[in-house]
Amino acid sequence: MNWRDIIYSNPNIYGGKPVFRNSRITVEMVLDLMAAGWTLEQMSDEFPGILPEHVPAAAAFAAEMIHDEQALASSRARAA
C-alpha cells in the first residue's frame, strides 16, 4: 500500500495539513492516537471515519517524512 493513495494535502483543509482522502481526519490525529496507545478499534469507535488502512498509511507517511528530514539535514551539514 502506498500512503500517497489515501493521504493528501489541500491548503483549504486544515491549512494544508495532510488528511485522509474523503475525510477531514488528519494524519497528525491518527499518529497522536497511536502514540497514546489507542487501538484501531478504539479509534474507529470514537472516530468512525478512521479506517483500518489509515493506521499503516499514517505510519508510512511519518517514516518517509523522517527519512526526508534526515536526508535534508545531512545535505545541509555537508554544505556547511
Feature map (PLM): residue ranges:
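Anion-recognition interface
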Residues: 22
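Basic, low-complexity segments
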Residues: 1-15
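Long, charge-rich, low-complexity alpha-helical segments
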Residues: 25-80
